[in-house]
Structures are given as C-alpha cells and as structure tokens.
A protein has these predicted regions:
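Hydrophobic, aromatic-enriched alpha-helical segments typical of multi-pass transmembrane helices
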Residues: 2-267
C-alpha cells in the first residue's frame, strides 16, 4: 500500500504534527457552531419566536405605509435580536474555522495535487464571504437594538428603513457568494477524496451532496414563495453536511499529520 504522505515523485512530505491538534479542534468547533447557528436560523425563519410584519397598503399613502412597516420590522428584529446575535456570531467564527482547515488540507494532501489545493483555495474564499455576511448583519443590529422607531417622523423612518434594506441586500448576496464558493470547494474536496490518499471516500460522497444542496439553495433563493424549501435545505446543509465535513476533515487531517514525518531544519 502506498504511503499517503509521499508525493508522486516519491519525496517524503514534512508536516508539522501540531496540525493534528489544530485541525481536529477547528473541525469540531466548526461543526458544532454551524449546527447551532443553523438551528437558530431555522427557528427564527419559521416564525417560532415571533411573527414578522407584512407590508400592507392603506389609504394613508405609501410614505406612511412604508414608515409603519419599517417601524414594525425594526420592532420585530429587536424582539428576536438575541437570535441574530447568537447565530451570526457563531456563523462568523464557524466560517473563520474553515481557514485553518483549508491550510491543513493543503499541508497534508495538497502538494502537487490540483483538487486539494483548489478545495483549500475556495474554502478560504467561502470563509471570507461568510464572515462578511455575518459582519454586515451586525451592522444592522446597531439599528435594531434601539427602540422608539414608531415615534420617528415618517420621512426619516422610510430613509433609515431603505438604508437597512440596502444593507440587508448586500448581506444576502454575500451569503449567496459564500454558498457558491463553498459549493465549488466541496466539489473539489470530493474529487480529492476520490483520488485516495489521506481522505476517505465517504467524505467525498458527503462533499458532493453538500455541493448539490448549496447549488439548490442558490437557485431557490431567487424564487419567491420557497421559504419552506430553503429552510429544509438549510437544515440539511447546516446540521448534517457541514458538521460531517468539517469534523471529518479535521479528524483526517489530524491523522495524516500525526503519521507524517516532522519538518526538518524549519522546512
């Protein structure tokens, strides 16, 4: 049986054994964080915490109607503020955790191999957009945490509401960008697993399933009236696929690092 720590030309790879503890810790953390954050997202999205307001045109006119809608929306966001802080705080650090996993993957499996290196690269891209998505949510929290919006003049309320709507759109598209990058990363991770070496074949199957789910989520997000489908896909990717991939990746990077030769002379 071939040694998975050797390159195609037979040179032994030097891997810092510290990657064993590091990759395992970040993988487990990411898996748990993604699962809890996803649960918090679905609980809020399905209206279990409170009912989100809907825009209703009246004889008062568009300005007044929009002002009342934005004031009610801010009141709702304040009511479920703890959920946003919990889930987006966890999402932020869960996406950050993908970076050490990506570097660890490249260390133990990426030398001279296209698939692991591209998987690592797109994991980092996904991490950046995912962190941006969570960060911009906290910008909106600065508005939602304040009360008394129903006392604000209509013109000012509409201006503030539209500004927050713009930020919400940027947040949503940052999330879609992270899904796209993560889908590509999972595709290449699946290819890396199929080619043998330090990564098991079953992890590749899960990675392919995750890539398909993420692509489906991107499509569904552009179709109105598909919230229930999106929630189901979110549960599948966040509470099943993400924990399996991140924890599995961390564990197998750790195993590969513990079985590889230590670096010599700082290399």
């Amino acid at each position: 049986m071939s040694d998975p720590t050797r390159t195609p030309i037979g040179a032994t790879l030097s891997v810092d054994p510290e990657w064993g503890r590091t990759a395992r810790a970040w993988g487990i953390f990411a898996g748990i964080a993604f699962a809890i954050a996803t649960a918090a997202f679905v609980v809020e999205a399905t209206g279990l915490l409170a009912s989100s307001p809907a825009y209703t045109p009246t004889a008062a006119g568009q300005l007044i109607d929009e002002a009342k809608f934005f004031a009610a929306s801010f009141g709702y966001q304040q009511q479920v503020l703890w959920d946003y802080v919990l889930r987006d705080g966890l999402y932020f650090f869960a996406y950050l955790a993908l970076i050490p996993l990506a570097i660890g993957l490249r260390e133990v499996a990426g030398h001279r191999r296209v698939a692991p290196q591209l998987a690592a690269a797109f994991l980092v891209v996904a991490a950046n957009f995912g962190c941006m998505n969570a960060f911009m949510t906290f910008v909106q929290v600065d508005y939602w945490k304040n009360s008394g919006w129903d006392q604000v003049p209509a013109a000012i309320m509409v201006a503030v509401g539209r500004d927050v709507d713009l930020m919400n759109g940027l947040t949503r598209w940052a999330g879609i960008a992270s899904f796209a990058a993560l889908a590509i990363a999972l595709y290449y991770l699946g290819r890396a697993c199929r080619s043998g070496g330090v990564l098991p074949g079953w992890l590749g199957v899960v990675a392919y399933v995750g890539a398909a789910i993420l692509l489906a989520m991107i499509v569904v997000s552009q179709v109105s009236g598909t919230d229930a489908i999106n929630n189901l896909l979110s549960l599948a990717i966040g509470m099943v696929v993400a924990p399996i991939v991140t924890i599995g990746l961390g564990v197998h990077i750790a195993r590969a690092a513990s079985g590889a030769p230590e670096p010599v002379d700082g290399r």
